[in-house]
Amino acid sequence: MRKPEVAIAASTHQVKKMKKGLWSPEEDSKLMQYMLSNGQGCWSDVAKNAGLQRCGKSCRLRWINYLRPDLKRGAFSPQEEDLIIRFHSILGNRWSQIAARLPGRTDNEIKNFWNSTIKKRLKKMSDTSNLINNSSSSPNTASDSSSNSASSLDIKDIIGSFMSLQEQGFVNPSLTHIQTNNPFPTGNMISHPCNDDFTPYVDGIYGVNAGVQGELYFPPLECEEGDWYNANINNHLDELNTNGSGNAPEGMRPVEEFWDLDQLMNTEVPSFYFNFKQSI
């Protein structure tokens, strides 16, 4: 059985055999000659066969990142930047897969370039776009609020000026009590009894509340009686007779000289309302 001191000494001797740290030019030349002549294989065997006191991981990283012939040097081109941004949007932080799609670039190099340059640039562009959007939306809200305030001020000014004119006596106080329920008051219209059968048709077309705030009045097309018309004609004839028909001009003579009023009023005229109901 081997003594513990001997086993510890052997293990420490093996550890001391593996070199760490910077690579010397002689080590780089040994690794390059072996890789060009034998090709890539198991990296532990490469370290042993090349006569290097390095581990397999150290040989692999040295070859991929520094010694391989197709390795690109220098800054990234704009095309490479676009590819990195596109691949990163698809693959995320899988730098080895991104490097496999960019010939001549290493995963460590791509990761450092992303964190130092591209990531900051994209963040700055997003902040600028958000600032532009906020500045473009703020004038619209300001214009809307200013228009609303201006309209409210205009209404207040109109009402205030109207009240001041009323206080000074320029406006009749009775004008302030305007009936809005009926825009055509019946007091100022000629009253006449007419048939209301046409009212449902008017309501069906224009609606019941077709006025400003109340019902819009449409005179019916057919009337049952014509007393109001006869009364107005008779009053007009009386005035002409009182003033003297002989002195009146030829165009202002009484109507009886031209036609018979009784016969005219008793003549049956086809009604539009009757034809309208028949067509329906």
Swiss-Prot record:
Positions of the UniProt region annotated as Disordered: 129-150
Q: Which residues bind DNA?
A: 43-67, 95-118
Q: Which GO terms describe its cellular component?
A: nucleus
Q: What induces it?
A: Slightly induced by salicylic acid (SA). Positively regulated by SND1 and homolog proteins.
Q: Boundaries of each HTH myb-type domain copy? A: 15-67, 68-122
| An MF annotation (GO) of this entry | transcription cis-regulatory region binding
InterPro entries linked: Homeodomain-like_sf, Myb_dom, Plant_SW-associated_TFs, SANT/Myb
| Secreted is among the record's keywords | no
Would the keyword Nucleus be found if you checked this record's keyword annotation? yes
Question: Where, subcellularly, is it found?
Answer: Nucleus
Quote additional remarks. Answer: Plants over-expressing MYB46 show a significant increase in mannan synthase activity and mannan content in plant.
Q: Could you tell me what this protein does?
A: Transcription activator. Involved in the regulation of secondary wall biosynthesis in fibers and vessels. Transcription activator of the mannan synthase CSLA9 that recognizes and binds to the DNA consensus sequence 5'-[AG][GT]T[AT]GGT[GA]-3' cis-regulatory element of CSLA9 promoter. Transcription factor that acts as a molecular switch in the NAC012/SND1-mediated transcriptional network regulating secondary wall biosynthesis. Is directly activated by NAC012/SND1.
UniProt protein name = Transcription factor MYB46
